[in-house]
Amino acid sequence: MTPVVEIELVDRSMSQSNAMLSGLGISPGLAVGQAFVFRDILHDLERYDIGTHQVEYEHGRIERAVERVLADLGLSAERVEAELNTDLALIFRAHEAMLRDPVLTKELREELEQELVNAEQVVKRVFRRWERRFRAMASEELRGRGDDVADLGRQLLQALAGIRTHVLENMPPNSVLVATRLLPSDTVHLSRKSVVAVVAEFGGPASHAALLTREMGVPAVTYVSAACDAIASGDTVLVDGFTGMVAVAPDAETEAGFEERVAEQRASWAAARERCHDPATTLDGVATAVMANIGCREDAVLAAENGADGVGLYRLEQLYLSRKALPTEDELLEIMRSTVEPVAGKPITVRLLDVGADKKLPSVDLSSEVNPFFGRRGVRVLLAYPELLHTQLRALVRLSRERDVHILVPMVTLAQEMKRLRELLVAAMAEVGAKRQPPLGAMIETPAAALCVAEIMKHADFLSIGTNDLTQYTMAAGREDPLVSDYFRDDHPAVLRLLRLVFEAVGNTPLALCGELAGRVDVLPFLLAVGIRSLSVAPPLVPTVKWTVRQIRLK
């Protein structure tokens, strides 16, 4: 965990010249700028003992710090909601909930009463313990929440110290931010007018900072070893968010060549955006549907603006996870109806709720899982909690009366799961008096599902391959784990062979591809060559993917 933060603006005369650093690209794009290095400095926080008569005073300091941080979190959520989207604002709403947790409040009080030390030491010790608990958890997603705990602890210590202004608010224009780790409270202070790219030593593609930088359209590279030591403030830095390469203080020839690539990228993006509403058809006439992944209405608006042919993956998780109580059937229907309104008239694939023990749902206890990624998740949870599934099926059947709705079942492993889902869907139709059955599809996300796809498709109207989890389970490597990041390759031959195997088995059953791989323009020729004709990508990528399809000749 990082206690009180101060900023060290590193400006060394002996920085590395023309050095090439490598990491993991977590937000695509190319950028050139001047390095702005900032790091959290671990201080020997002032420590002093207190008497029992001073406990209330120190506790009052903690309470006031909590209230100040809660106010700041509220402002951060409002800012992100206004400038980016509602889903990302939920990051800060979740931080508010964590800070209000009565268990945390009790532990802070007990630490103060038992140890009789000042408020700063109490906050430091308690949040360090909480961070270690999260870092030790089996679930990759829960381990990632250690960043959230560290962030909150740091903000409380800043509040106790009276630090108000965040240095990132005063970054000069054309800056490449170089940091040890970028936490959500840092990211919210970034300005598109100032920061052109981010380089960090830690933070995976599913981190909150990654989500925020992608939404801002800022190229970002993480897992760059010793970045804060290898790069000095003021250095010219070239950042390739596609390949994860970072060039420091490049020579004139290298910089000129990179500037040409940046200009080409801008020109191609402009051309792609201009034709984003045109069909994506290869040079030899093969049509490909380029759909969008969405999680909220703002995503749907962007998808429509960028020419998406429909919604290939509507995720319901944020809808559920942002609530204190499970939505009723009517509430769920109204939210989904409002969300998909911007893409009216186009096909919409809604994935049933995909949760496990790594995602806490109100009124649903999944905490007993030994390993959430190898336990009950996706369809397994839905079948274990029939009412949770029943509400979704009824709402989706009702929505299908108004929209071209397809229902996608997550994390299917066995054909029996799809058979049971079909039975429950038919029952839900009878209950609401619906005559037309929405197409029911299976998500292929595990090697078992890929190898047994012939049996699964007997009970499915369509299939969708989720390459993120398929890669994770095939390569036995988590996306967030830097120790195995070299193994997490969605273009590895093992993954691509599974894709080919699935396509060869499906025959005339419609098949779509979603996940990070679907937006990889370098892999598009292979995907189209094996027969993929429907791709679902993040809304900002739709124009580029459609433009790339038009440059490909298959025969």
Predicted regions: what they are:
Residues 270-555:
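Conserved alpha/beta-domain cores
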Residues 1-342, 348-355, 381, 385, ...:
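Non-catalytic, soluble scaffold/interaction modules
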